[in-house]
Amino acid sequence: MAKTKDKNEWGSNLSFLLAMIGSAVGLGNIWRYPYVLYSNGGGAFFIPYIVAILIMGIPFLILEYGVGYNFKSSFPKAVKSISKKWEYLGWFLPVAVFMILIYYSAILGWDGFYVIISAFKGWGADPNAYFTGSFLQANDTLGGLGTFVPFVAIAMLVGWVIMWVISHTDLEKGLGRVSKVLVPLLFAIMIFIVLFSLTLPGAGIGLAELYNPDWSLLLNFNIWMAAFGQMIFSLSLGMSIAFTYASYTKDDSDLVSNALWVTVANCGFENFAAIGVFSILGYM
């Protein structure tokens, strides 16, 4: 399949690498993975987890890279170039990603607002009551789910504007530069949080509870499904993100080593985050 050249490409392999790490590392690593690890055998979970990395995570990421690199186009266009009558199937993934982005933008809006009020602990003595009552203004009725909260809407709007500006800027000057700043900053913040959490009283209790292995679960099919599911979710496999990013790589890009580094960074981050989460839970 001949490649269609696109002048808009990554300025360096580092930009591509950090952008891919930024797309992989996210809320699933911080919120989801610690729970999955704990509820699926603790330390025993690492066996199916490593197997999932080796036979699904790395190979499928390389596959997405290779296909995206070859077609040098969006996923719908790639499907169209194979068969025009199946082009509509190619739009399912971008639409799915957009739907995910909608609820992610809401969570990011919450996070942005909490960054501001964290300076003076604006949630008061009862954080749960503040979040559901004052912040979301939710109640037990069905109508309470649709309450319009102006400051949350503003926070979401700011997020959408930022994303629009970045996505409508030259790839290297926009997403490339942003990734070079925000991805290292994210890792630096997480390192600080985890190191601090390890100094808290009871941190060892939380870690012992997290990593206490239940070897009997290795015979349970569900733990293996959880490991492979986490790998798909964490690396965003099959969502056309890696496909799209790889379509903007230069001809001499080393896609295999990039896939290895992305997998190592992603899996390392979520395991590091799990240490911080359960250290804090042990303290609580």
Feature map (PLM): residue ranges:
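Inter-helical loop and helix-membrane interface segments of multi-pass membrane transporters/permeases
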Residues: T4-N8, V36-N40, N70-F92, A106-E172, ...
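Hydrophobic alpha-helical transmembrane segments of multi-pass membrane proteins
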Residues: L18-A24, I50-I55, F92-Y103, V158-V165, ...
